[in-house]
Design a protein with these regions (language model features):
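Long hydrophobic segments that form regular secondary structure
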Residues: 295-332, 389-390, 398-404, 411, ...
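A conserved FAD-binding loop/helix module that cradles the flavin
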Residues: 314, 454-482
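N-terminal cofactor/phosphate-binding cores enriched in small/glycine residues
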Residues: 42, 49-78, 89, 185-188, ...
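FAD-site-proximal beta/loop scaffold in flavoenzymes
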Residues: 266-299, 383-458
């Protein structure tokens, strides 16, 4: 970073994006990977702030200014090594993190004249945040292509082994840290590939599945063992794991969808978000089983209920399945929606119509979906979490036509029947209690640890990675290895 005024001479420039007219017909990633010159040019825009807000806004606290400097200077392998010190899945987070409200939203260059943070990209009065997410992706992918792999040469085997339940972000984060500290992780997952919802829930226009295939090869090279198509409580008992392993980590995510609690949710034509997305991914990957239902939106009038990233995935998948129309209804305004601004923008470009401040009160139809009854809302005072509460406007009911309705209100944990048998305590929402014990992320069973969505509730990939990594440190302390 030789020129501290580079940001004045060089504007923010994202990786090339496939035009909406092309990308809406294909399940391929829409952002091209930066080349070396582009990545170095953009990395050199970083100011190297003395108090880097980007680093603190990042849930895993990536050493962002440091690896940006290394990229700017052309030190790719060193940047990859540093990136992997804090993040087990940097090439994934570079793709799917909502950088506009995390690292890039906190970038000093991403402020207007009054210091108010603005979403990613160019903005009035500011200079445009450093392209942190795309550079993070560039570092790992180019380093892997050039032959870089995590350095395990100084790792000394401890003779300890830990069972990890779930090959999603939390489980992979935990296994990564354990392996780097000489503990043998054995990861169990019910699916036929690692990644959990990274593989089977996130559509390929956000992340193509070879990314996780490559990551699996990297992890196996580190000594991590995967036992797939194996469900705990069905194929292997929890007691067997407790008998064979020195500790157990649970990172099983959240898969039970949250209902809206209004009439008509059980009508034919109403779909849950995850089964819809999973069926599409499995079809794209040629993994669909003969008895598996594929939910096809071709020629249908689709209404998606919800405003998070899962709702955006449903919107954009429906577009690619050639739906006749796709309408997304959300009960707050665009500014207060939970999803990534980038994803909303991409969905809008691809033809999704948004109805803001609309709350569903009924799915209407005789024996099948015919429409959705909505009411208009206004934003009232903030709730306990600081979010403004939608207030219904009297007399504002309307019915919009629909052939299919996809419910994307979020997900909650699904406590397993064997939890009680093994003294695993959950709260009223079904989340595993993993605090207040002697070690980080230790459950009420001393040998069992947990992290990710099943502990905190449905959240980001990067928060699950962080909790898995922190839980691994708790396990190391429990095993007297710290």
């Amino acid at each position: 970073m030789g020129d501290v005024f580079r940001f004045l001479k060089q504007a923010r420039r994202d990786g090339e994006k496939t035009p909406a007219s092309v990308r809406k017909h294909e399940f391929l990633e829409i952002y091209a990977l930066m080349d070396a010159a582009h990545a170095q040019e953009q990395a050199d825009r970083c100011l190297g702030c003395g108090n880097p807000y980007c680093e603190w806004k990042c849930p895993v606290h990536n050493y962002i200014p440091n690896w940006l400097k290394l990229v700017a200077e052309g030190h790719l392998f060193e940047a990859a090594e540093l990136s992997h010190q804090t993040n087990s899945l940097p090439e994934v987070c570079g793709r799917v993190c909502p950088q506009d409200r995390l690292c890039e939203g906190a970038c000093t260059l991403n402020t207007d004249g009054f210091g108010e943070a603005v979403g990613g990209g160019p903005n009035v009065g500011g200079f445009g945040a450093v392209t942190i997410g795309q550079i993070e992706r560039y570092i790992s992918e180019e380093a892997f292509k050039a032959g870089w792999r995590p350095d395990m040469s100084n790792v000394v085997a401890t003779g300890k082994k830990v069972a990890v339940i779930g090959a999603g972000p939390a489980g992979l984060g935990c296994a990564d840290v354990l392996a780097r500290n000489g503990v043998k992780p054995v990861v169990f997952d019910r699916y036929d590939e690692i990644g959990g919802l990274l593989t089977f829930g996130i559509p390929e226009f956000k992340m193509e599945k070879w990314v996780m295939t490559n990551r699996r090869e990297v992890f196996e090279g580190m000594g991590i063992e995967f036992r797939l198509n194996t469900e705990i409580g069905k194929d292997v008992s929890m007691q067997a794991l407790l008998d064979e392993y020195d500790a157990v980590f649970m990172g099983m995510g959240t898969y039970t969808y949250m209902k809206g609690g209004f009439p008509g949710e059980d009508l034919p034509g109403v779909l849950e978000a995850l089964p819809f997305l999973i069926s599409n991914v499995r079809k794209c990957l040629d993994l669909a089983k003969p008895d598996e239902i594929f939910h096809d939106m071709k020629g249908q009038r689709v209404v998606v209920l919800g405003g998070g990233d899962t709702a955006m995935d449903c919107n954009r998948t429906s577009i690619r399945q050639e739906a006749a129309s796709v309408v997304c209804a959300y009960r707050r305004d665009e500014k207060n929606m939970p999803g990534s601004k980038r994803e909303v923008g991409n969905a809008r470009e691809e033809g999704v119509q948004f109805l803001w401040n609309r709350q569903p009160v009924e799915i209407v139809g005789d024996d099948k979906v015919e429409g959705v009854k909505l009411v208009t809302t206004e934003l009232g005072p903030p709730d306990a979490r600081g979010r403004r509460t939608p207030v219904v406007v009297p007399g504002s009911e309307e019915v919009i036509p629909a052939d299919r309705v996809i419910v994307a209100f979020g997900f909650r944990p699904n406590p397993q029947p064997w939890f009680e048998q093994h003294q695993i305590t959950t709260d009223a929402g079904g989340r595993v209690i993993a605090n207040g014990q002697a070690h980080a992320f230790q459950t009420t069973h001393p040998k069992i640890f947990a992290g990710g969505d099943m502990v905190r509730g449905s959240d980001l990939v990067v928060t699950a990675v962080w909790e898995g990594r922190e839980a691994a440190k708790g396990i190391l302390a429990y095993l007297d290895l710290l």
